[in-house]
Amino acid sequence: MSYLSVGDEVLIRGELGIVRFAGSTDFESGIWLGVELLNGKGKNDGSVKGKRYFSCEKGKGIFVRACSSNVMKRPSVVKSRKKGSENISNFMEKTKAIKQKSRREPSKFERSLARPLCITPIDSSTPTKTATFYTSSTTENLDELNFSTEELSSFDTTLLNSDTSKLSGLDDSSFMEEEFVWQVDNVLQECEKKFTPHSKGSYLKENLKSELRKGRLDELMCENTALKEKIDKLNKELEKVEPQLTFLRSKNSIEKPRNFRREKFLKKFLAMQKEIKYLRKRKLQIRKIPNYKYSDRSLNSKTPKSQDNWTTQVTPSSLLGVSEVSKVLQLKQVQVDITELVKIPKNPFSEKLTISNVNRYLNIVPGSLDLQFSLTNENFVHWNSTVYQELLNLKSNNSSVDGVKTRRQLLEENALLSHKVLKLTEEIQDLETLNQLNTEIEARQSEKLNEVQEETQRLSQLLISSQPALTEVKHLKLCLSDSQEELLQLNAKLEKANIVIDELNSAKLKLSKQVEEESSMKDDLTEMNQRLKEQIESYENEVNSEITSRTLKEFETLKTQYEKNLCNLREQLKTARMKLADKYPQGDNTSENIDWLKHSLRDSNTENSIPSPLTFACKEIRKLVADIKPVSVEKQLALNWKKDIERPSFHHNQQLFNYCQLTDILSKKC
């Protein structure tokens, strides 16, 4: 496919791909296309037998012949709505014009093809009316005929090829449409989401298919109009060529009277040649007569007086010579008339001997030559009879009267005869030149007749061979008329589809406006959220900064108080220990003391049994736990201590242990 190039999107057996290479390869002859498949169902990565033609991922490249029917160019979608309506109006106008043309009468070209070609046979025996000669313009007409026949044959071949391609394109149109629908499926799905009914989606698919068919049919109709314009041009050319064909048909009738005239002319020419031969023989016979001796010197040496004596001594026989001289003068006048009519130079080969010149000469001569040759023939016969009578008279005079004829009389007769012979020789030369011209004309005309016959045969064969093509053209016209009706129906459907598409487009515009409004609302909400977050963060930062400053101050004050209280507690503990040691002196047996403490704590209430410094310390610890805010080990211990104190069944030994542990930690920090 010559219309594919690198970068085009292609469908190969229903799979989408991109052309990456186009040209000849080393692995096989011909033009190949290297295609990168998008689905990845190929055979290579753009290289074959170690040579790389293009680069792609492995398993996505494939090579396909450019002329294969599996490769199809991906069609383009017409998005503009206005262009579609304009195309429909143009298409309707074209279909109306095509219908009007198809309903017209058959052209002259069809009539000439329907009419059989009549070729008249050449018959030299039956003469016909005279016509104009075949001039040099016929060669130009024949060239035009050959050119027109070649155009007809080429036009027939182009018609057949274009029709087959159109039919194949129409067959493949449905395949193209089914492959192209997948491009629109995404748009249809979005529309179906917005316009929930399923019927609208299917209707849109049908509309898209009809749009595809419409674009395909637009191309076909444009091609059809171009072909019809070519047919009209060829019809006009055939109308121009028809007079030339009639001329060629009448050429046979033109040549018949020519042949008849030539035969008549040749007969006259042969008769004149016989007369000339006879005159030559008579001249020889006259020279053989006795006392027929003279010399040029004697003639040149004659004086005017002797000439006067010669003129005075006129005999009856010399009168006969005068009559002969008058006849010779008549013959000379006839010859002059013939040369004026024919207008051929004495040396015809000095000029260019062309068919046009000869035809001009022969067009002038035909009527007058017959009359002049008849006159010359009669004059020659009369002159021959007179010469014969004069010879008889001369013989009788020679026998009867001795010495009557002098040498001068014989010289006069000889001079007259020689003058006649010279004139006759000139006429013979002219006739020979005419004969040569006629022979050349006959040869050329025979050649042209053969050429014309061959061309007529070729034309008849071409007409016979073009008849099946014409029948096919008529059949295609019928098919086109059917397709035009289908196109009209499709146009009606397309108009309805355009109305529905307009409604859908209006709905799409409304939805797009709503979506834009929603998107603007979302943007406003996001901006508000961001502002609130920023305000909250700023407020939290301010609050945290205030809280931290307050807590630090309070912690410092509490710390100082706690340190004071700790010092007091230490002193009180020391005194309490001393008192306990004094009050309960039981040696170093601590386990017994602990058991005793447990027993005493169980039996008595906590507040009454615990000594006063201990209760004071518990209260202080509770206050500290309530005031301390930052999380630390001290806070955790204080919380545990608070929980233990709040329990009703709390053992004092554990309470004391926790208290001691807390005091140790605080003492270490202090």
UniProtKB/Swiss-Prot annotation:
Coiled coil, from the record: 209-254, 404-582
Entry keywords, A to Z: Coiled coil, Cytoplasm, Cytoskeleton, Meiosis, Microtubule, Phosphoprotein
Domain annotation CAP-Gly: ranges: 23-65
Cleavable signal peptide: none
UniProt KW Nucleus keyword: no
Subcellular location: Cytoplasm, Cytoskeleton, Spindle
GO BP annotation list: dynein-driven meiotic oscillatory nuclear movement; meiosis I; nuclear migration involved in conjugation with cellular fusion
Name of this protein: Microtubule-associated protein ssm4
UniProt organism field: Schizosaccharomyces pombe (strain 972 / ATCC 24843)
